[in-house]
Amino acid sequence: MLLVIANAPKDPLARTQGAHLADLPPADFSRRLAGTLPRVLLSAVAVDRVGALVDGFQSLGFAAFSCDPTAAPSDEDRLLVRNIEVEAGAMALLDGQGNHHPCIGASLSLIQRGVRVTTTSETVTTTERRLDVGRAVMTGGLMVTSKAKKQSIETEETREAFLLLQRNDGQPDAVIYERRIDYRFLGADKQPASHANLERTLARLRALAPNAPVDDRVARPGFVTGLPLTSSDPVDLGLYLVTLARTRGL
């Protein structure tokens, strides 16, 4: 289990007591809580111990909760949106097969912004011809070459922004990736750049669901990279932590 801090008091005494409760040096305690909250203070906490730790931190004025990282939803649990249809204030999300999934504005409880980074590695083999001096001497000065194979690993990093539409009507959450959706539904507002189109899509969603807050913590620098390694994808874990914090009004 993870022990998560969603808000921390500024009182130095409370923070000193919090470091003692977590059995951490004060400097390490402060470092783990630096940056955008919520932050994971402790990982791999025993199930029978995490509840007492949450209670202890709450008594010191911290907003704390526990989290099972294996419960974090992934894209396998979400609707991947390929197109959107809007008519008379009603919206339908279309999947890759063209199936319509009705979605009224009131059913959106939260819109999260994020960036998913995908790294791909490929082994590249090249063949070079080199002058074989030894064989050239043996053949009386004839130019003799030999083949040498060289392997290198080429790594490519791809960043793609997305919008996570979280629903409160029992239907699966939906995710809109910047470069995986057909933006023709924007009509005259469609722009040449995908990033600009994603921003216009967000603007339309906010107009349809004015009561749904927009949270960009997962997209902020250092938020996802500051999470501990778990069995869940770091971006999915970050989205889940923000969701849990939001349900607590944080």
Residue ranges and their predicted role:
Residues 43-85:
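Anionic N-terminal interaction surfaces
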Residues 89-94, 99-120:
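Phosphoinositide-dependent membrane-docking surfaces
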